[in-house]
Amino acid sequence: ATEDGDTTVIDLLPQELRRIGLFPCGRLDKNTHGFVLLTNNGELAHFLLSPKHHVKKKYYFETKFPLSSEDKTALEGGVDIGGYITAPCEVELIGEKKAVITLTEGKYHQIKLMLAAVHNQVIYLKRISFAEISLDSTLEEGSWRYLSDSEIEILERRF
């Protein structure tokens, strides 16, 4: 648990998996749902999280206000989030207030700040893939599974 008593992803694991030193490869903000990769390989985690390797992280999000094609263009080109211009990204509009964004960096509250830069607000955010591995749609929130052989191969090809 965290200092404020909140449950962490490690708290959700069986005791035998906690003992082998698993840790999250990256993080999700408190109100963000979705895919978290757990590993006990520090070199792999460092590689996947290093901005120079441009590992893709894909998020589904919903906004308070409709998203325009101008918003999409601005987000894709990079926006100022407090003195930092975000790297180019991909945005797929899938509804008036719904989209999927693919980032290759992971600044603190980045998507929320990016949407604020185009005068909008994130009301729901979920990571749906990391390093070309997609969230298993059959998993319930708070549950986990081992990677498949093909998913391990994806990571080995990158690493």
Model regions and ranges:
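Basic, flexible Lys/Arg- and Gly-enriched helix-loop patches that mediate nucleic-acid binding at interfaces
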Residues: 1-159
